[in-house]
Amino acid sequence: MKALITGASSGLGREMAFALAERGCELVLCARREERLRELAAELPTVCHVIAADVSDEEECRLLYSAVRGDDLEIVINNAGFGLFGEFLDTDLDEELRMIDTNIRAVHILTKLAVQDFAKRGHGYILNVASSAGFLPGPLMATYYATKNYVLRLTQALREELRHRNSAVKVCALCPGPVDTEFNKVAGVRFALNGLDAKRV
C-alpha cells in the first residue's frame, strides 16, 4: 500500500509519515524542501520516495500526481498549507494568492485526480487537512479561515456524493485546533490556547 503526503517535511505531515510507516505503508513524501524530506526518509522504517514540489504551482501539482498514480496508490493526504496573520486591509495580496493556490487549488486538483482514479478501482482514501478554522469566521486571518472552510465543505460534499454512489472510496477532513508546528512561525501568530503536540493529532 502506498500513501502520498504533501507538506511532509514538518509538523502534521511529518508525524503522519511516521504513523503510516509504522503500519507498513510505502510513502511518497512531498514538500518544497528536498533536504528535509530526505532526512525524514532516512528516519522512517519503510520504503520512501521523495518528490520536491511546490503544490501551489498547478503544473507541479499535476506532475506530482502523474508521478505517483498507479494501482498501488491507496492513500492521498493533502496536508500542505500555510496561513498569514494580519488585517485583511494590510496583508500582502501576492502571499494571499499563493496561500489560496496552496490551501485550495492544490487540494482541489489532487482530490479530483485521486478520487477519479479511486472511484474506477472502487477503493482508496483521501484525507484533506482542514482546521477548526473552517467552522468559524477569522478576523486577522480572514483568507486562511476562508481557505479551510473551502477544504471542509468540498470534502463534506464529495463524501455525500460518494455515499450516494455506494462507493467504497473514503474521504475525510481533519479539523484540528491550534497545533504546535512551524505553521505558527510562518503565519506570524501566537494563539491564546497552547497548541497540541503534532504527534497527538
What residue spans do the PLM features occupy?
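Residue(s) in the substrate-gating loop at a strand-loop-helix junction
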Residues: S131
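Substrate-binding pocket helix/loop in short-chain dehydrogenase/reductase
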Residues: E87-F88, E95-I100
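Active-site helix of classical SDR
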Residues: T111, T147
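The beta1-alpha1 cofactor-binding region of Rossmann-like NAD(H)/NADP(H)-dependent oxidoreductases
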Residues: A53-L63, L93
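SDR active-site lid
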Residues: R153, E160-V201
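Conserved glycine-rich cofactor-binding loop
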Residues: S9-S10
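Conserved glycine-rich Rossmann-like NAD(P)H-binding loop of the short-chain dehydrogenase/reductase
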Residues: R23-E39
